[in-house]
Amino acid sequence: MHSVCSIFLSCSHRVIQAKHPPFPLFHSYFHIPDFLSFVFPFVASPPLAFARRKLDHVPKKFARSIGPFLLIVFLFFNLFPTFFFLPFFPDTTKRPNLAD
């Protein structure tokens, strides 16, 4: 599930990035979501599996709330930089009207 979500978010982020390329100042910053969306499933899976085995004494209510929390954090890191800075970038898909 995490890998499907990360692939979808990574692709959607790249589509938006293609229409609104970042300024050089933010260029390295805008690759953070791509990096996180690729690394997240691999990094998060072993610790979560380990925690699930070792923390049997943790109440199930708390254990159920960790998954949605991680998903929210994951979505925040993927979508927030894109949509927060989007209005500040020029839309390079518009071509000048040569008839004027």
Curated annotation (Swiss-Prot):
The chain crosses the membrane at residues 30-50, 69-89. GO terms for cellular component: cytosol; nuclear membrane; nucleus. It is a multi-pass membrane protein. The keyword Mitochondrion does not apply. Keywords: Cytoplasm, Membrane, Nucleus, Transmembrane, Transmembrane helix. It is found in: Cytoplasm; Nucleus membrane. This is Putative uncharacterized membrane protein C191.04c. It comes from Schizosaccharomyces pombe (strain 972 / ATCC 24843). The lineage of its organism: Eukaryota, Fungi, Dikarya, Ascomycota, Taphrinomycotina.
